Amino acid sequence: MYYLNKMLEYNKENGIIINKYIRKTIQKQIRIHNKYIYRYDRVTQAIEWIEDNFYLTTGNLMKIELLPTQRWWYELMLGYDMIDEKGVQVNLINEIFLNLGRGSGKSSLMATRVLNWMILGGQYGGESLVIAYDNTQARHVFDQVRNQTEASDTLRVYNENKIFKSTKQGLEFASFKTTFKKQTNDTLRAQGGNSSLNIFDEVHTYGEDITESVNKGSRQKQDNWQSIYITSGGLKRDGLYDKLVERFKSEEEFYNDRSFGLLYMLENHEQVKDKKNWTMALPLIGSVPKWSGVIEEYELAQGDPALQNKFLAFNMGLPMQDTAYYFTPQDTKLTDFNLSVFNKNRTYVGIDLSLIGDLTAVSFVCELEGKTYSHTLTFSVRSQYEQLDTEQQELWTEFVDRGELILLDTEYINVNDLIPHINDFRTKTGCRLRKIGYDPARYEILKGLIERYFFDKDGDNQRAIRQGFSMNDYIKLLKSKLVENKLIHNQKVMQWALNNTAVKIGQSGDYMYTKKLEKDKIDPTVALTMALEMAVSDEV
């Protein structure tokens, strides 16, 4: 346990806190150490070979120097052997789960693991795989390995002499016929394999569990095999990531001598408030990533629930939902103003139409002296209002009494019934209707209204606005304007809708509007965002 002890000394000297999950892994190693063959020689050979031959391939081109924590990970991966049922000495550890905060060099570390296996692993004709959610992510790790063949003096010589070469199938070390290939997360393609080393990258993105399909082939056909699951945590629930976290926290897995879990994460959400605790999730912080970068992300997330979710998931290792309320009470506060700001002013319109069930909203915005002013006409049908529970009906009644919610005595929202109210707003304010944005799925229903107010030969005054993640930029722009008090509204129904509004966070960090509860209507928010997009389009 030489490298465990070195890591513990390093942590003490540098104020790195170990969470309860890593403490459990240490207890497990101590138990295993007393039962199996310790391979200090193999671990040290791997570490020295990596540090002698490999380079950082981003930033300054300099040789890799593994930190004590990373050396300990190598001790867990390579440090123990057992005698199998055939009397053969084999590597003990088949599975490693590394849950580690973003920016901690996981892919670079895995590149060294692959190359160590290809050149020093001694498995003639063996195959190694990197498996990822899609080809782009698989290529990220694959390219880390290939870059080493150009940066490393030793591998460059191998490369030039065609000992280490790139083929259509992947990378090959000719001396041992070992290969490294990339593969996407496809269960059918994974059937029947016989790989010896499997790197499952960013497992938080996986829906179905491909690991067993890959591991089955390795287990049945290889004496020495290892699968490594790496992730920075994520926002996709009920997939492979949740399954792995639950498994590697369990007592059953603690007593499985052929696996190690490295769950670097906070133990609860409250711990994020004390920066000293961040080392639980980012044990290499200060080296990778930099303290300043993580602090900046933390500060940017203040006042933004969606960014807070992402920070806790990707930096602090916590399983988080991919949906979060987006606007804070401070963002949605009312500011009184006079509708005269619209007088003779270019006015942009967004319309979110729902025939029944949700609200229909027509939002008007204009710009004046560096601020954006908004006013929204919100509609429902009386029969829907009458079916509300008492609490909701009291809330809607307040909106009706304030003149902010208009109840129509029809079975569903008829577009023709909106026209008198739009006319009334235009007459009362003297605004100049300029452009309209609308959901393309509703165009045929809205066509008459759109042509009435926004007809032009080229159609420049009308824009079909795609819904979902396509609205990402304008969702974030609306948030920014509200935070900076540059978007002014004075309607309680809009405040309510903004407070109801959640965002779903996509894999690339994009947002789309959603709601957590059916009773939480967000249509005024959507209409306002479309109107804002039209205002911006007129400036470009």
Swiss-Prot record:
Mn(2+) 1 binds at D352, D424. Its EC number is 3.1.-.-, 3.6.4.-. Binds 2 divalent metal cations per subunit. Interacts with the terminase small subunit; the active complex is probably heterooligomeric. The keyword Methyltransferase does not apply. The terminase large subunit acts as an ATP driven molecular motor necessary for viral DNA translocation into empty capsids and as an endonuclease that cuts the viral genome to initiate and to end a packaging reaction. The terminase lies at a unique vertex of the procapsid and is composed of two subunits, a small terminase subunit involved in viral DNA recognition (packaging sequence), and a large terminase subunit possessing endonucleolytic and ATPase activities. Both terminase subunits heterooligomerize and are docked on the portal protein to form the packaging machine. This is Terminase large subunit. It comes from the Viruses. The keyword Disulfide bond does not apply. Keywords: Endonuclease, Hydrolase, Magnesium, Manganese, Metal-binding, Nuclease, Viral genome packaging, Viral release from host cell. Mn(2+) 2 binds at D352, D523. One of its GO terms (molecular function) is endonuclease activity. Pfam families: TerL_ATPase, TerL_nuclease. Belongs to the skunavirus terminase large subunit family. PANTHER family: PROTEIN YMFN, PTHR41287. Its cofactor is Mn(2+); Mg(2+). InterPro entries: P-loop_NTPase, TerL_ATPase, TerL_nuclease, Terminase_largesu-like.
